């Protein structure tokens, strides 16, 4: 029986047995209590619906990411310590947030291969296919990387991780990605990219010793900037999307924690990362899927039929940049939340320096897949996309020898080979691209 079943739908009638003022007062009081209880239940019911029931057409991933996770206990702590244990003399111990993500998986694997201690953290939200994230998790587990299932907004979990392991570095790659999705679910971007980042920095600044932090910003911070190539000193005060605005906010927040608490912080502005184990919401990925299925693909063009181009950067080059930034990151200067001196604060572009028209990307995919694409040319919508990106990487080259080496033709060939091997059609693996 529902707890509301004992509340009558109508007041009904009853016969007064006692006309005394005391009795009248008592019955009025009881009636008031009943009404109060009823409306309280209605009020809390509405609160429940509002906060815990999101519309089907607009799922709130920020709420989903706060679901209850199971962590803690001796066995769990043993796995955490084992994964984070340094295997080489000069190795470091790194907490990688967003470890089940595209870049996070590749970076975690690379760190582990060279003998560093690596512990992953990911909330496995369903912004895109979670089975792909689970496959990445299985891949990392085979190499000895344990991914803690939890959220960066869980302060207790973060504090526990730093109690169990004195991390020397944090590679912060957890974020709500995607430019267009921000128009559907803006709260998830504030929740993950701003609140989550602040939460992580709060724990890091109180740690003893404080870790050095390398984190993923984005090339989207350049927004409506028209000066090319994009350089780190160019203006970034014209974001074209909420996603870009949250990443720009992250850079300002990083400056604040560096200035007040002495945290060593390095931001990396990624330029259109692609490759095996990529994100299904990226154009090269869903173009491949739709071309194979015979579906039409929408290709955007700029004003007056202008070219839309991207500085596509292969994942292996991005990983080299991440490790280079990590290896040259200086120690934080604070301790227990108190600054002891000036700390390092940097930001770098990680791109390929060779913008390629999206139409050329489609042509390459057609050759690799041996399928002609059904092209649908469309005007670039005002949803946060920009007509071009182009990275100036001279700062990263100078600081840690960053030098991308994979052209788009080579990188897409590797991606297509992985895609055809990973996804099956009719229960059989599709033949690999030539």
Swiss-Prot record:
Physiological role: Involved in the synthesis of the negatively charged monosaccharide that forms the backbone of pectic cell wall components.
Keyword Repeat: no
Organism for this UniProt entry: Arabidopsis thaliana (Mouse-ear cress)
Coiled coil: none
An example Gene Ontology CC term for this record: Golgi cisterna membrane
TM stretches of this protein: 32-52, 91-111
EC number: 5.1.3.6
Catalytic reaction annotation: UDP-alpha-D-glucuronate = UDP-alpha-D-galacturonate
Origin superkingdom: Eukaryota
Protein name: UDP-glucuronate 4-epimerase 2
InterPro entries, per database record: Epimerase_deHydtase, NAD(P)-bd_dom_sf
Membrane-related topology note: Multi-pass membrane protein
Active site: 243
PANTHER family the UniProt entry points to: EPIMERASE-RELATED
UniProt subunit comment: Homodimer.
Compartment(s) of residence: Golgi apparatus, Golgi stack membrane
Family, per entry: Belongs to the NAD(P)-dependent epimerase/dehydratase family.
UniProt-recorded Gene Ontology molecular function terms: UDP-glucuronate 4-epimerase activity
